[in-house]
Amino acid sequence: MSVTKEIKTDIINQFGGSEKNTGQTEVQIALFSRRISDLTGHLKLHPKDKHSRHGLLKLVGKRKSLVAYLKKTDIGRYRKVLADLDLRK
């Protein structure tokens, strides 16, 4: 299941401040996290879906690099995002 437009705007407003602020690192991490959780649920129902698993691993890698970038640039925002999204270090 893909992320609907309403869910996407809610995430953007929550993490970006306004719906025009889509490029902020926190917003991108939150959107990736939502897509990752949706794909994880899909893979629990369909464990042999290798193409979706590959896409999931690509999303996890992209989110990991964004989290590393945020840690390098602004440690305060990094800690806030980890707390808000319940991500591990």
UniProtKB/Swiss-Prot annotation:
BP terms from Gene Ontology: translation
MF (Gene Ontology): rRNA binding; structural constituent of ribosome
Entry's Gene Ontology cellular component terms: cytosolic small ribosomal subunit
Domain of life: Bacteria
Entry keywords, A to Z: Ribonucleoprotein, Ribosomal protein, RNA-binding, rRNA-binding
InterPro entries: Ribosomal_uS15 (IPR000589), Ribosomal_uS15_bac-type (IPR005290), uS15_NS1_RNA-bd_sf (IPR009068)
Quaternary context: Part of the 30S ribosomal subunit. Forms a bridge to the 50S subunit in the 70S ribosome, contacting the 23S rRNA.
Free-text function comment from the UniProt entry: One of the primary rRNA binding proteins, it binds directly to 16S rRNA where it helps nucleate assembly of the platform of the 30S subunit by binding and bridging several RNA helices of the 16S rRNA.
NCBIfam families listed in its UniProt record: S15_bact
Family: Belongs to the universal ribosomal protein uS15 family.
Protein name: Small ribosomal subunit protein uS15
Gene that specifies this protein: rpsO
